[in-house]
A protein has these predicted regions:
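Juxtamembrane intracellular "pre-TM" segments in multi-pass secondary transporters
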Residues: 1-14, 195-229, 408-415
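Helix-loop boundary and gating motifs at the non-cytosolic
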Residues: 10-62, 227-228, 232, 236-254
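Short hydrophobic/alpha-helical segments at membrane-entry points of transmembrane helices
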Residues: 20, 106-112, 228-229, 313-319
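Residue-level signature of mid-helix packing/kink "hotspots" within the transmembrane helices
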Residues: 61-70, 155, 269-277, 361-362
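Helix-to-loop junctions at the C-terminal end of transmembrane segments
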Residues: 68-80, 276-287, 372-373
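Structural signature of the two symmetry-related core transmembrane helices
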Residues: 83-97, 290-305
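Cytoplasmic helix-loop-helix junction between adjacent transmembrane helices
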Residues: 113-151, 336
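C-terminal membrane-cytosol helix-exit motif in multi-pass small-molecule transporters
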Residues: 180-202, 391-400
Length: 415
């Protein structure tokens, strides 16, 4: 495609955008495969009692996904977004097979190493490609739609695997979904997805944002907006790692069956996913700082309340509240990062952010696992809730008053 014929925008590129949304739903479904049943698999089939040992699969996933995120950002302009997406799906193919036939917990950890690499390559690629297609004005909406598809799929597949496990056993049937998702995701990406590098070149011609000499340092520490968002991303996934590993175990201790565990654990990513259709658009027109502050605060409150409630209704409501808080921040993270960086450095900056964000999975699993082993699950959950509230305070203090990056010149000329 020639640069002169390229037009940025959601409407102008709706076919490729819609295809990438579908692909990202399959990417999310691969994570949903594990959300409700892997901690149970650890206790019931492998006899693991140490919470740190059980959460080792999340540590493996988080570290490898974080590293894959970073290198996807670094290599996107060199290797190509589509090529990285296809490689990610190829790596995903053996994951459900390993989970079906694993006779040792180490194989489950290996499967999650592959899952982390695959997720880093596929999800990061689809995120960056959608940013490339739509341009600056609709980027929040685009990220909302992207994350909606991904995390709604997480919720749906988490529910389905919980239901199948309840009626037909934890293995092998729930993991057949993963075989379907990985094969179809690979075919769609390989045959129909088109690379978006030329869109970046087109947008870079009109960008007024200066390039940074050190993208990693600027995103992580130097820039107040970028660093505030980055720490919040880490804490967000830190608490998500804890929820992923400990919530099913907490619900097992409360004597919920697999079906109800599947429902409660599915509500959180489902609300998270669906809510982003609204919050993504809001991040284009409303204060990003306020959305990030209130989102992290809501998450922290919901998490701290978890150990004190025992009924299905109250826990389902908290799961929904946690999902709402996450929906407020997730598309806002990405749209803020994208708008604060030069188009030619966007992929690397997003990759740096996603490196730290997804290291949160590993850090959260380690902190909550060790705390749960020494003091109990309830104390681990409360500690993570406190850290999440602290993150909201950091946003309030460090992030500039407004981070909307409005194109004032464009607005004046339109008038």
């Amino acid at each position: 495609m020639k640069e002169d014929s390229i037009k940025l925008g959601l409407k102008e590129n709706w076919q490729q955008f819609a295809l990438l949304v579908i692909v990202n739903a399959f990417v999310g479904g691969m994570v949903g495969l594990e959300r409700s049943i892997i901690p149970q698999l650890a206790e019931m089939e492998f006899g693991l009692s140490s919470k740190s040992a059980i959460l080792s699969f999340i540590v493996a996933f988080g570290i490898t996904k974080a590293i894959a995120n970073y290198f996807t950002g670094r290599l996107a302009n060199k290797i190509g977004r589509k090529n990285l997406l296809v490689i990610g799906w190829i790596i995903a193919l053996p994951i459900p097979i390993l989970l079906i036939y694993a006779n040792d917990w180490a194989w489950v950890v290996v499967a999650n190493v592959l899952l982390g690499i695959s997720q880093g390559l596929t999800w990061s690629s689809t995120v960056v490609m959608k940013m490339d297609l739509v341009g600056e004005k609709q980027r929040g909406l685009a990220m909302g739609i992207n994350e909606f598809a991904g995390y709604l799929a997480v919720g749906i597949v988490a529910f389905l695997t919980g239901y199948i496990a309840q009626n037909y056993g934890i293995r092998p049937y729930p993991f057949y979904i993963g075989i379907f998702l990985s094969v179809l995701g690979l075919l769609l990406s390989w045959i129909w997805v088109k690379d978006t590098k030329t869109f970046v070149s087109q947008e870079a011609k009109t960008s007024t944002i200066l390039k940074n000499e050190t993208v990693f340092w600027t995103t992580t520490f130097k820039d107040k907006t970028l660093s505030a968002v980055t720490q919040a991303g880490l804490i967000n996934n830190l608490n998500d790692g804890m929820i992923w590993g400990l919530l099913p175990i907490l619900l097992l201790q409360l004597k919920f069956d697999n079906n109800n565990i599947g429902i409660i654990t599915a509500i959180y990513p489902s609300v998270w996913g669906m809510g982003q259709l609204v919050t993504g658009k809001l991040s284009d027109i409303y204060s990003k700082k306020k959305m990030l502050f209130w989102g992290m605060l809501l998450q922290g409150i919901a998490i701290i309340l978890l150990p004190f409630l025992t009924s299905f209704t109250s826990l389902a409501a908290l799961s929904a509240l946690l999902g709402l808080g996450t929906a407020l921040v997730y598309p806002t993270f990405l749209s803020t990062i994208a708008q604060a960086t030069n188009p030619n450095q966007r992929a690397e900056s997003v990759g740096t952010f996603r490196l730290w964000r997804d290291l949160g999975y590993a850090i959260g699993a380690i902190i909550s696992g060790v705390t749960a082993d020494f003091f109990g699950i309830q104390y681990a959950i409360i500690l993570i809730g406190i850290l999440t509230i602290a993150s909201s305070i950091i946003i309030q203090i460090r992030m500039p008053k407004e981070a909307k990056f409005v194109d004032l010149v464009g607005i004046l000329y339109k008038k």
